Amino acid sequence: MTYLGIMRPEDILKPTPAGLCSGIGGFHIDPVRPVDKALITHGHSDHARPGHGAVLATQETLDMMRLRYGENFAGTTQAIAYGDRLKLGKTEVSFHPAGHVLGSAQICVAANGTRVVASGDYKDVADPTCMPFELIQCDAFITEATFGLPVFRHGDPGAEIAKLLRSVALFPERGHLVGAYSLGKAQRVIALIRAAGYDRPIYLHGAMESITNYYVSRGIDLGELRAVRDTKKAELAGAIALCPPSSLQDRWTRRFPDPVSAFASGWMRVRARARQRGVELPMVISDHADWDGLCATVAATGASQIWVTHGAEEALVHWCTLRGLEARPLNIVGYGEEDEGAAEVTEAEA
């Protein structure tokens, strides 16, 4: 195997029970248990956990961890800007936009001329609420594979928003509830609704408020937003409201007149999932790369080694192997869907 440098990628990063570890750098990336020094790719709770001795992340990710876990979520914190380089042990690290959510980053770890890029979660399509994915040439690319099967092709999110707005126009007497993850997906859906020309107030479940307000404070224009808890039931007829997916099936929905249940997720490509959740209006909108995006990104990095961290590892590993790339699953346990429990509020607060 030929590398740009003289050090093997596995000498720079390797999987451990705590997550990806750089022994020569003295840190872990997105560790699943408390460690001395953690580099965090983004604020979703399956990647950003409290209790580490020190955390290095973008300012937005640090801020979101504070919102979720409180001021003392780590012993110490340090913010790093996109593109800045920092020496850690015998490595040099830099953070680059991942296009997943606000502040999300790929982490490039370099040593002796060899570069390993840990993608975290990413997508390669436009998103008005975060910086676009930046392609980095590297020797080894560590990719997610959440939607790592050919069946997952997300399509145009604008078309999914158009479905929602047609339903709102068709059923003006019904409230429309859109289930969406509280960090990233909710704000992107709101921005897409605004881009489609919808200028009426959009209503928020209590669990959405703090992170959505943070997005607004960072210059993301989301139009007029109102809290559901401050609104009478009659006013919610014909309205659009955003809530955590778990709230679509609880008594919170009684606040709305004859609600239409929608869910914005890449998993809505699988009709059985929509039926299982009782979703009336599935919306295929994802903050993860689909099959085509994963394959295109892997090929474009120029990496000769592809390590797959979580998702449908086998299919992507097989695709890489057929193209002469050295690929393997890392089988790291602990990553997956965002844990909405990290953002839940009580019924009274919602």
Model-derived features: where do they sit?
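Short acidic low-complexity segments
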Residues: A18-V32, D84-K87, G223-A239, P245-W252
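Active-site regions of enzymes building and remodeling cell-envelope glycoconjugates
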Residues: D36-G43, H52-Q59, E71-I80, K90-V93, ...
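Short, well-ordered alpha-helical microsegments
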Residues: A48, S104, A126-D127, A186-I190, ...
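Binuclear metal-ion centers of metallo-dependent hydrolases, dominated by the metallo-beta-lactamase
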Residues: E134-L135, L149-A234, Q305-A350
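Short secondary-structure boundary segments
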Residues: Q59, A145, G206, G266, ...
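C-terminal regulatory/interaction regions
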Residues: L4-M7, A227-A350
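His/Asp/Glu-rich metal-coordinating catalytic cores
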Residues: Y3-R33, K37, G43-G184, A195-A196
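Alpha-helix capping/helix-boundary segments
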Residues: S45, T61-L62, K185, M208, ...
